[in-house]
Curated annotation (Swiss-Prot):
Residues 1-305 are cytoplasmic. InterPro entries: SNARE, Syntaxin, Syntaxin/epimorphin_CS, Syntaxin_N, T_SNARE_dom. Residues 327-331 are vesicular. Part of the t-SNARE complex. GO terms for molecular function: SNAP receptor activity. Disruption phenotype: The double mutant syp42 syp43 exhibits severe pleiotropic defects, including short roots, a large number of lateral roots, semi dwarfism and early senescence. Plants lacking the three genes SYP41 SYP42 and SYP43 are seedling lethals. Contributes to the regulation of secretory and vacuolar transport pathways in the post-Golgi network, and to the maintenance of the Golgi apparatus and trans-Golgi network (TGN) morphologies. Vesicle trafficking protein that functions in the secretory pathway and mediates liposome fusion. Required for extracellular resistance responses to a fungal pathogen. Also involved in the protection of chloroplasts from salicylic acid-dependent biotic stress. The keyword Transport applies. It comes from Arabidopsis thaliana. This is Syntaxin-43. Its main location: Golgi. Keywords: Coiled coil, Golgi apparatus, Membrane, Plant defense, Protein transport, Transmembrane, Transmembrane helix, Transport. Residues 235-297 form the t-SNARE coiled-coil homology domain.
């Protein structure tokens, strides 16, 4: 069952409550009202913490209100706090999975280097560690892929563009991580096969020495038995290497399936850049058209009938004023 840690959110609400209640009374009454508001006591003194319909991404977005009802004066000292949408939690969870996968991949690289080093032991512990780390990384990648599909399946909303950008970014990071793991596994597989070929050459040399030693004296039989023990040990190592190679091949196949699923979610960065350039060009052309329309409207306003009428009226008023002055002078 999936759970979410709300300790930080609780502390945020508690600190907000303290800052609001501090100027309203003494420290003792503030502590009492804080306890009553958080525990739901019927005191009527504490404020109500209410999750109202506000958003961190869009102030016009509405969410389901969650409030603690106080039977007393609940309208006094109300604190309004907005909650982010659900897909933000999903994206944060995917980011945590990707970070854990990166850490495990670093440990896996060290385990690969340690397992490929020549040693006198059987290497079962290193192989078990490699197998465990590979399974953990693959599990984290699959879980991230499922959460990413859940994020892409979210319905349309007012912040869908932000959600799509976050989805593309996480999908790109997940694809790069899968490619890196696939490359590590392929390199490890090649080096294992190379060591296997070297072991086969060593076995052939030991077999030749054993056949040659059969014609020697009885004193050389002890050395021949020692060679036989080496051959058996080499055969056991070859069998273990075969198992390791098979496990690596299976993990590479799983990674190939993950890459195939991610290819449907990742959008090429060049396409995004082209889309941005296209939008910028559209904005530039729209601004140019708007400027032309404004200039045309200005010319039309200057040469319109209203301007002509106003000009004629001003001229007539001036003529009438002159005639009035002349009339007064002559009479």
């Amino acid at each position: 069952m999936a759970t979410r840690n709300r300790t930080l959110l609780f502390r945020k609400y508690r600190n907000s409550l303290r800052s609001v209640r501090a100027p309203m009374g003494s420290s003792s009454s503030s502590t009492l009202t804080e306890h009553n508001s958080l525990t739901g006591a019927k005191s009527g003194l504490g404020p109500v913490i209410e999750m109202a319909s506000t958003s961190l991404l869009n102030p016009n977005r509405s969410y389901a209100p969650v409030s603690t009802e106080d039977p007393g004066n609940s309208s006094r000292g109300t604190i309004t706090v907005g909650l982010p949408p659900d897909w933000v939690d999903v994206s944060e969870e995917i980011s945590v999975y990707i970070q854990r996968a990166r850490t495990k991949m670093a440990e896996l690289g060290k385990a690969h280097a340690k397992a490929l080093m020549p040693s006198f032991g059987d290497g079962k512990e290193d192989q078990h560690q490699i197998e465990t780390l590979t399974q953990e990384v693959t599990f984290l990648l699959k879980k991230s892929e499922k959460q990413l599909q859940r994020l892409s399946a979210a319905g349309p909303s007012e912040d869908s563009n932000v959600r799509k950008n976050v989805q593309r970014s996480l999908a790109t990071d997940l694809q790069n991580l899968s490619m890196e793991l696939r490359k590590k596994q392929s390199t490890y597989l090649k080096r294992l096969r190379l060591q296997k070929e070297d072991g086969a050459d060593l076995e052939m040399n030991l077999n030749g020495s054993r056949y040659k030693a059969e014609d020697d004296d009885f004193d050389d039989m002890v050395f021949s038995e020692h060679q036989m023990s080496k051959i058996k040990k080499s055969e056991e190592i070859s069998i273990e290497r075969e198992k390791e190679i098979q496990q690596v091949v299976e993990s590479v196949s799983e990674l190939a399936q993950i890459m195939k699923d991610l290819s449907a979610l990742v959008i090429d960065q060049g396409t995004i850049v082209d889309r941005i350039d296209y939008n910028i060009q559209n904005v530039a052309s729209t601004v140019d058209d708007g400027l032309k329309q404004l200039q045309k409207a200005e010319r039309t306003q200057r040469q319109g009938g209203m301007v002509m009428c106003a000009s004629v009226l001003v001229i007539l008023c001036f003529i009438m004023l002159v005639l009035l002055i002349l009339k007064e002078i002559l009479l």
